[in-house]
């Protein structure tokens, strides 16, 4: 399957986006950007911080082609959203980890990209404050499209390591949790 990076590059040219926001674990694992493949995202049903607003990968897969374990070509769905009776195989394969079919083609629903987006990064001394801030921002009238907390908690394995490795902003030293809130709109 095609790398997500390539798909997003083409979509950006047309001011479109994959609304489920493919997550990139490269930053957490080795500090490098490598989104992986579209098939991997679908097989694992992995979505990024926009999931609570736009839905998961399975909500954006319109159809697919692939090969099952018997070597048979399987085709499901199409290029438009429609309600059908019976099993929706396009939704069933999401999160199946490739056990049902090896994907060769995927049709995604895409949405217009926002004209503007800003991400606020707030350092908090206590995790409780970070959680409260996140809850208040999501329930506010602002168009929050993504939110995350990176805890600085000794009880959470590797939390200090990830913050120090990934989020050194302009060489600023900080202690505590990080709350990230993204607001989109026009």
Segments (PLM) and residue ranges:
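FAD-binding glycine-rich core of flavoenzymes that anchor FAD
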Residues: 1-91
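C-terminal substrate-binding/cap subdomain adjacent to the FAD-binding core in PCMH-type
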Residues: 62-186
């Amino acid at each position: 399957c095609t790398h997500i990076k390539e798909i997003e590059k083409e979509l950006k040219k047309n001011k479109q986006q994959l609304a489920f926001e493919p997550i990139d674990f490269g930053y957490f694992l080795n500090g490098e950007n490598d989104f992986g493949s579209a098939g991997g995202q679908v097989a694992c049903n992995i979505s990024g911080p926009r999931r609570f607003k736009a839905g998961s990968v399975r909500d954006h897969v319109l159809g697919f082609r692939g090969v099952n374990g018997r070597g048979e070509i399987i085709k499901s769905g199409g290029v438009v959203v429609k309600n059908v009776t019976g099993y929706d195989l396009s939704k069933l394969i999401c999160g199946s980890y490739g056990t049902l079919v090896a994907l060769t083609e995927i049709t995604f629903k895409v949405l217009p990209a926002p004209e503007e987006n800003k991400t606020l990064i707030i350092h908090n001394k206590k995790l409780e404050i970070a959680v409260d801030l996140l809850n208040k921002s999501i329930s506010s009238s602002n168009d929050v499209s993504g939110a995350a907390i990176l805890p600085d908690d000794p009880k959470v394995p590797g939390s200090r390591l990830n913050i120090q490795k990934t989020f050194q902003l302009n060489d600023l030293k900080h202690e505590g949790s990080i709350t990230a809130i993204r607001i989109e709109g026009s």
